[in-house]
Regions:
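Extended hydrophobic
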Residues: 206-257
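Cys/His-rich microdomains that often coordinate metals
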Residues: 2-5, 22-23
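Surface loops and adjacent helix of pleckstrin homology
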Residues: 10, 28, 238-240
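Short Cys/His-rich micro-motifs in 6-15 aa windows
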Residues: 20-28
């Protein structure tokens, strides 16, 4: 078991403790655990650190010494995902309100029924209980045109994890179904939904390994985890807030608003005092 900070992974690619070279434990990727595809890393370790630094600097109120790279642990990891293809379809009942065109003091309420369908292809969802689903979702999208047929050579130098959530497990399918049915609902309904009868069917489920740089740092006794898309560089993770910066911003904002109000008022008083 290896990991980044407290982030533990069931590895199928690991490292020699003596020379640091990569060693692939092939038997862990046999049978149903053998991926269909792999998406290779295109973002280097240094690039990932640059993405992390920019992510911190672009955010407001982050303590200046939080993103000191001396405190960062980083590891390139192939995360197990499944790509789901299929169709969502069904019927929705909705209603929306609109100000009456004949009497602006009245509200017209419209009810209606809509039916529709939507095909979807290669919707990603991680299949690891150890990975935070929201964090993995937040670093999408990935370019699936760059997928390669799985080969152990791509794992060299990286950690990798085999899936521990069944690709057709009911909760996993519901997660994807909810996502697609929400998209269909947005396409069909204006206003609120009063009832819905939607369902999703799956025509293909592909097992792939996705490139993610996992970063971990400790700050004031708390551990912070970040993920960098190993293909695009998209970076996400929770950032701490420096109280001093927040209060400084509040002070400057208060002074600015006060100046906007007080200065015109001052000149108005001067002008009124000069009126005979």
């Amino acid at each position: 078991m290896f990991g980044v900070g407290g982030f533990r992974l069931s590895t199928v690619a690991t490292f020699c403790a003596y020379c640091g070279s990569a060693d692939i434990i092939k038997e862990r990727l046999e049978g149903k655990f053998r991926p269909d595809y792999v998406l290779p890393f295109t973002i280097s370790k240094d690039d990932a650190l640059d993405c992390y630094t920019k992510h911190c600097k672009d955010a407001c109120f982050v303590p200046g010494h939080f993103f000191d790279l001396k405190n960062i642990k980083i590891q390139g990891t192939y995360v197990p995902f499944c790509l789901y293809s299929g169709r969502s379809e069904g019927t929705l009942k909705g209603q929306f309100e609109q100000t009456s065109s004949t009497n602006r003091d009245m509200i017209d309420v419209y009810s209606y029924v809509r039916s529709g369908k939507m095909d979807f292809a290669r919707i990603p969802a991680d299949v690891s209980v150890k990975m935070d689903n929201a964090l993995m979702d937040s670093i999408e999208p990935f370019d699936f045109n760059q997928l390669k047929e799985f080969n152990y050579a791509y794992l060299s130098g990286f950690l990798a994890e085999k899936y521990d959530v069944e690709r057709d497990e009911s909760g996993q399918l519901k997660r994807v179904s909810d996502r697609m049915e929400s998209s269909l609902q947005q396409e069909l309904i204006k206003g609120s939904v009063s009832s819905s009868d939607l369902k999703s069917t799956f025509s293909a489920i592909e097992y792939v390994l996705m490139p993610v740089w996992m970063l971990c740092t400790e700050f004031e006794g708390k551990e912070y985890i970040f993920a960098v898309n190993g293909q695009s560089g998209t970076t996400e993770g929770f950032l701490p807030c420096a109280a001093s910066k927040k209060w400084l911003w509040f002070f400057i904002l208060t002074i600015s608003i006060s100046a906007v109000i007080i200065i015109p008022l001052y000149f108005l008083i001067i002008w009124l005092s000069n009126i005979d």
